């Protein structure tokens, strides 16, 4: 199977996201690469499902919360950028501050 560098990147993101999903389901807090992969995969899937760039920029901020990542990770991830394939071509989706820190999250 011959894959382009972009296709290899997407497969690596997907693989890391699957691992992150399994850990999240077990209640294990995600580290930096797992959190970025999890958010990135959600954006890539959303693009394949037909969501717009604007919808994905909003959606990307709802995928993970403060309690699902290790301490300090939400502050480390200032933005996530993903090149996603849409029906009209490839576009860069940027999600700023994807893991929002909420007071009620800290109490859980």
Swiss-Prot record:
Pfam families for this protein: Urease_gamma
GO MF annotation list: nickel cation binding; urease activity
Catalytically driven reaction(s): urea + 2 H2O + H(+) = hydrogencarbonate + 2 NH4(+)
Enzyme class, UniProt record, top EC level: hydrolase
Domain of life: Bacteria
Keywords: Cytoplasm, Hydrolase
Example GO BP: urea catabolic process
Homology family: Belongs to the urease gamma subunit family.
Protein name: Urease subunit gamma
Subcellular location: Cytoplasm
Record's GO cellular component terms: cytoplasm
Lineage: Bacteria, Bacillati, Cyanobacteriota, Cyanophyceae, Oscillatoriophycideae
UniProt EC number: 3.5.1.5
InterPro entries tied to this protein: Urease_gamma, Urease_gamma/gamma-beta_su, Urease_gamma_sf, Urease_subunit
Biological pathway: Nitrogen metabolism; urea degradation; CO(2) and NH(3) from urea (urease route): step 1/1
Subunit note: Heterotrimer of UreA (gamma), UreB (beta) and UreC (alpha) subunits. Three heterotrimers associate to form the active enzyme.
């Amino acid at each position: 199977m011959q894959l382009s560098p972009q296709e290899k990147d997407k497969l690596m993101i997907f693989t890391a996201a699957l691992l992150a999903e399994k850990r999240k389901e077990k209640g294990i807090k995600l580290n930096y690469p797992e959190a970025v992969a999890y958010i990135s995969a959600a954006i890539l899937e959303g693009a394949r499902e037909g969501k717009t760039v604007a919808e994905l920029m909003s959606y990307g901020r709802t995928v993970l919360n403060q309690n699902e990542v290790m301490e300090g990770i939400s502050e480390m991830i200032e933005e996530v950028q993903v090149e996603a394939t849409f029906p009209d071509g490839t576009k860069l989706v940027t999600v700023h501050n994807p893991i929002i820190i909420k007071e009620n999250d800290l109490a859980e």
